[in-house]
């Protein structure tokens, strides 16, 4: 198939292609880095259980909603709400999703650049080029941060210019199996090391006394970010779906892939932390586990250096390659959302749209590269608050504007007997009551 260069909408070549692309959007640093470190710092197996419940009971219903809106409209998040309703407010909701995606991508690419740099640091450290290795691990060096972020953005732009099937789908079909293979290989190695089983027990044996309201809302926020909800990515990906596809089934596959890889990442990172502890590397600060950033960018590299030799270098390179692949799969979907908006609403062909939007985001990324203190504020505004707000308003759109009858009419494509199914009885309850209430409470809790 030729590369998509016109303003015509693309489509997925296969069901597997969509599942891998949507799962690739979901499986990013939030799964490989964020989820394991939150499990480790906020409740162990108790957090894992709450996260799984939030993902299936809140994340999955919203995912079905986003995909159905996308496929019914065949448009980007802004255009989707224009097509499906005359309501003037909800296109602004779609625009908010586009803005959130752009701003998340702007700081995400800086963090992704750190991971990419650390992969080379391991090689330079092994070769004795210590000064170069220290430069690559100095997150306070703005020029280095900017260079790595630009490299990451250029790779993302290049993939997006290829279109839906030849760019996004082809890239994720390669990266997802590679990602899973790397995780499993590293798990097998880590499990042979002293201290690993202590980490496994911490991860898999629940202590329900550690469940608190804060833990529940942290797990809910993690589920939202992990599944790429609320920013329009799944509306955009849904707009490329064939009418013959069963959306609830596809959403279930994507959710299972997301939690499955998050679980595997936890099975790698948490035992690795305790292997580091067994090797004499301090993983606690006082009574508290070190921060997530320290765990990934200080403690694990120290472990690889302690192992030393070819094995230590290989593990370090492979681990940070894993983070880089996970990040790239997410930056693809984050950039596709505003690119789709420009293509649909402004009728600019894909290649020009990708470069125009991509370079705009890159400029913001470079600013953040020199002011990394902005990352925390941007993450709070556009991720911690922005994504749940988007998800809440999507629920309200289906409940009060588009109505469930229209939603079910769309879902009947690919699932002809949906109105007779258990899903038809349960989904509206979650989408109208449980999901909005839980999400709203989560948003409010950020201000209390």
Task: Please identify what each model-predicted range represents.
Residues 1-34, 62-67, 71-84, 88-95, ...:
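Membrane-interface "cap" regions at the ends of multi-pass membrane proteins
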Residues 2-8, 12, 16, 169, ...:
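Membrane-embedded translocation segments of transport machinery
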Residues 6-9, 37-42, 77-96, 109-167, ...:
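Inter-helical loop and helix-membrane interface segments of multi-pass membrane transporters/permeases
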Residues 14-54, 233-235, 249-252, 256-259:
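Transmembrane helix-boundary motif of multi-pass solute transporters/channels
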Residues 17-19, 25, 142-147, 257-263, ...:
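Loop-to-transmembrane helix boundary motifs in multi-pass membrane proteins
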Residues 34-51, 70, 85-86, 114, ...:
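Transmembrane helix-loop boundary segments of multi-pass membrane transporters
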Residues 324-334, 354-364, 382-411:
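Hydrophobic alpha-helical segments of multi-pass membrane transport proteins
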Residues 371-397, 419-448:
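A generic transmembrane alpha-helix motif of multi-pass inner-membrane proteins
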């Amino acid at each position: 198939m030729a590369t998509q260069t016109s303003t015509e909408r693309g489509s997925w070549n296969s069901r597997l292609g969509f599942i891998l692309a949507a799962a690739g959007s979901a499986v990013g640093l939030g799964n490989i880095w964020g989820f394991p470190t939150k499990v480790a710092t906020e409740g162990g197996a108790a957090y894992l259980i709450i996260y799984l419940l939030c993902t299936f009971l809140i994340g999955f219903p919203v995912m079905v909603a986003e995909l159905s809106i996308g496929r019914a409209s065949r448009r980007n998040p802004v255009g989707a709400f224009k097509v499906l309703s005359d309501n003037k407010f909800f296109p602004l909701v779609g625009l908010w999703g586009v803005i959130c995606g752009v701003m998340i991508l702007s700081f995400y690419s800086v963090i992704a650049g750190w991971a990419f740099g650390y992969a080379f640091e391991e090689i330079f450290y092994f070769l004795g080029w210590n000064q170069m290795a220290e430069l690559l691990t100095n997150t306070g060096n703005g020029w280095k941060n900017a260079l790595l972020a630009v490299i990451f953005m250029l790779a993302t732009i290049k993939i997006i210019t290829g279109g839906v099937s030849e760019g996004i789908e082809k890239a994720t079909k390669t990266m997802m199996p590679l990602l899973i293979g790397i995780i499993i290989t590293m798990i097998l190695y880590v499990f042979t090391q002293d201290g690993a089983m202590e980490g496994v027990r911490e991860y898999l044996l629940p202590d329900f006394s550690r469940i608190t309201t804060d833990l529940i809302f942290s797990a809910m926020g993690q589920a939202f970010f992990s599944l790429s909800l609320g920013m329009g990515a799944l509306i955009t990906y849904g707009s490329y779906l064939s009418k013959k596809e069963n959306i609830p089934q596809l959403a279930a596959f994507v959710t299972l892939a997301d939690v499955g890889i998050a679980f595997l990442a936890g099975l790698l990172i948490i035992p690795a932390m305790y292997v580091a502890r067994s090797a004499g590397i301090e993983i606690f600060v006082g009574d508290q586990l070190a921060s997530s950033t320290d765990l990934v960018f200080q403690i694990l590299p120290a472990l690889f250096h302690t192992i030393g030799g070819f094995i230590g270098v290989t593990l370090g390179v492979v681990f940070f390659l894993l983070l880089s692949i996970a990040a790239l799969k997410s930056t693809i979907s984050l950039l596709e959302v505003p690119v789709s908006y420009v293509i649909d609403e402004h009728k600019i062909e894909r290649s020009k749209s990708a470069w125009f939007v991509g370079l705009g985001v890159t400029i913001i990324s470079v600013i953040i590269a020199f002011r990394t203190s902005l990352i925390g504020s941007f993450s709070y505004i556009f991720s911690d608050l922005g994504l749940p707000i988007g998800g809440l308003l999507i629920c309200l759109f289906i409940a009060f504007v588009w109505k469930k009858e229209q939603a079910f009419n769309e879902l009947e494509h690919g699932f002809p007997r949906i109105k007779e199914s258990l899903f038809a009885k349960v989904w509206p309850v979650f989408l109208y009551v449980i999901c909005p209430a839980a999400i709203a409470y989560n948003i409010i809790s950020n201000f209390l």
